[in-house]
Amino acid sequence: MLFTDLNGDQARQTIDTEQVFAAYAAARTELDHRYAGSMAWKTVGSHTYLYRKRQGVWKSLGARSSATEEIHSGFHQGRERVQDRITNLAARLDEMAPVNRALRIGRMPIIAARVLRRLTEARLYGPVVGVVGTNALYAYERLGGVQIAGPQLATGDIDFLYDARKSLRLVAPEAAAGGLLAELQKVDRSFTAVGNPGFRAVNRDGYLVDLIMPAGTDPIRRPPRNRIGSAADDLQAVEIERLGWLVNSPKTAVTAIDARGYPVQMWVIDPRAFALHKAWLSTRGDRDPLKRSRDAA
C-alpha cells in the first residue's frame, strides 16, 4: 500500500502535540513582538526617563510618572509571564516527544526539521522560500491523516522554492545579509556551496539543500533576483521552467513531527498543485527515469 491510516492513538497524540505546539509558537511570537528588546530607567540631568530599546535603538517613553511606572512594570511582568509560559510549554513538548516516537508519528528527518526551524527563526521560511519535492509529503500525509509508505519518502535532500517577488525587508537582518547558506551553517557548520556560484549546499554527511526558482518568461525584462543574501558566496537559485504556477499556488501551514518526536512548522504549496506538478514531471522525456516513476506514484 502507498499509505496507511493513522490509528486512534496516533491521531489523538498528533492532535495533542499540535495544540501544545500552537500555544508554544504563539507565546514565542508574543515574546518576539510585544516584549522584544528591553526597557529601563535613565537619568538625564535631574530628571529620570523611561526608555525602550528595540533593534539597538533607545527611545524615550517619557519622564518618570505613575503612567510610565505602570508601563515599566507591565512590560517586565508581562515578559516574565510569557517566558514562564514558554518554559512550561517547552517542557510539555519534551514530555510528548518520546510518546511520539513510541507511536511512530515522528516522521521528518532530523536535519530537515532543524533547517526548517532555523529558516523560520530567520523569517525566511514561508514568505520567501517554501518546501517542494519529497519533503513536502510529510505535510501532505498530515493533511490526509495518513502515513505514506517509506520508499516514497526516501530522500537525501530538501528543495526550497524561492519567490524572488517577496520583499526581504521583513526578513531578519542577518539573514538578508548572509543569505541562505549562512543560515544553513548555523544548523551545521559543514554546509558548503557546491560550485561558485552554486544553487546547492551539502554537509559532511552528504545531505543536500537545493534552491530553485521559476525561469523568467520575458527575455526583455531584467532577470529576477536569484539570491537571498548579499554575501558573494550565498546560494544562487537555479531557474527551472514551468515553476511559475507553483510560486503562484496557495500556500498552507502544516505541523509535521520529526524523528525525535518534536513538532516543526511547514509551509507547502496546495497539495492539488503539487500533485499536478508531479504528474507533469512524470511525463517529461528529459526527466531521470528513476525519478519519473516516483513522480507518477
Question: Where are the regions that the model predicts?
Answer:
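Compositionally biased terminal segments of proteins
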Residues: 1-48, 53-297
